[in-house]
């Protein structure tokens, strides 16, 4: 995936999912009246790839992420980030707030208030890292398309 690729992320950000734990079956059950959940997609573009300087906790994976032009919403974490063909490129994990470097001052109720300006971007675990983890845990999956495209990475500490 290259910067500028149209993407979409899905999830259930506005849901209050009430569950109970069933000791007998050792499983969670969704309470009556919760379903159907409100499904919510939001679109954007792939802005860049980010390779963190540090490795995973176990030390065996380079931490590679996809950054998107739109933030993920609470409730979309763990959901897919995919292109217009439905190919999954990443898994949403967090939203970053990048300072824009200017701070306009506004007046409110007779007081001056500094407004820090940020760009909110979504962060997802890159599909290459997901594939590596699934291979290591013997989880089968299918890859479509040409993954030999040269990709650019931003090195981030």
What are these regions (language model features)?
Residues 1-61, 65-69, 84:
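Serine endopeptidase catalytic core focused on the charge-relay Asp
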Residues 13-15, 29, 42, 92-157:
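C-terminal cap/linker of serine protease catalytic domains
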Residues 34-54, 70-78, 115-135:
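A short, hydrophobic secondary-structure junction motif
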Residues 71-92:
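Catalytic nucleophile loop of clan PA
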């Amino acid at each position: 995936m290259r910067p500028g690729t149209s993407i979409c992320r899905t999830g259930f950000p506005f849901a209050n999912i009430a569950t109970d734990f069933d000791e007998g079956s050792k499983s969670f059950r969704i309470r009556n009246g919760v379903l159907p959940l409100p499904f919510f997609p939001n679109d954007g573009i792939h802005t860049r790839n980010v390779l963190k300087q540090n490795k995973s906790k176990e030390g065996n994976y380079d931490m590679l992420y996809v950054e998107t032009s739109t933030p993920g919403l609470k409730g979309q974490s763990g959901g897919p980030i995919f292109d217009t063909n439905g190919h999954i490129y990443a898994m949403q994990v967090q939203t970053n707030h990048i300072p824009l470097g200017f701070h306009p001052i506004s007046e409110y109720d007779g007081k001056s208030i500094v407004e820090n300006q940020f760009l909110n971007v979504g962060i997802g675990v890159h599909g290459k890292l997901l594939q590596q983890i699934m291979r290591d845990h013997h989880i089968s999956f299918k890859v479509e398309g040409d993954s030999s495209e040269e990709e650019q990475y931003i090195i981030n500490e």
